[in-house]
UniProtKB/Swiss-Prot annotation:
Protein name from the UniProt record: Elongation factor 1-beta
NCBIfam families: aEF-1_beta, PRK00435.1
Species this protein is from: Desulfurococcus amylolyticus (strain DSM 18924 / JCM 16383 / VKM B-2413 / 1221n)
Sorted UniProt keywords: Elongation factor, Protein biosynthesis
Gene3D superfamilies: 3.30.70.60
TM ranges: none
Gene name linked to the record: ef1b
Top-level taxonomy: Archaea, Thermoproteota, Thermoprotei, Desulfurococcales, Desulfurococcaceae
Recorded family membership: Belongs to the EF-1-beta/EF-1-delta family.
Length: 90
């Protein structure tokens, strides 16, 4: 089965949210077949940083990235989820 790489930008609820803990909660919430490969922090403004996550997921997922977006948005500490990039892996 083919897979896709999805780059997701996650904004925390506030500046006080520890991004490392948020990343671990998101990684723990991913279902089977999904894998968090890489991550980094992106400065936004006034001390606020976003998480940029590289997630591998199955290509034939009903609803595309919507399932992933909904799953991440339900994690405690997440304010906003935005898909920045999607690419099929060979």
């Amino acid at each position: 089965m083919a897979q896709v790489l999805v780059i997701v930008r996650v904004l925390p609820e506030d500046v006080e949210t520890p991004l490392d803990e948020l990343r671990k909660r998101i990684a723990g919430a991913l279902p089977e077949g999904y894998e968090l490969k890489m991550w980094d922090e992106e400065p936004i403004a006034f001390g606020l940083k976003a998480l940029r996550l590289a997630i591998i997921m199955p290509e034939q997922t009903e609803g595309g990235t919507e399932t992933l977006e909904n799953l991440i948005s339900q994690v405690q500490g997440v304010s906003q989820v935005e898909v920045e990039y999607v690419n099929r892996l060979s």
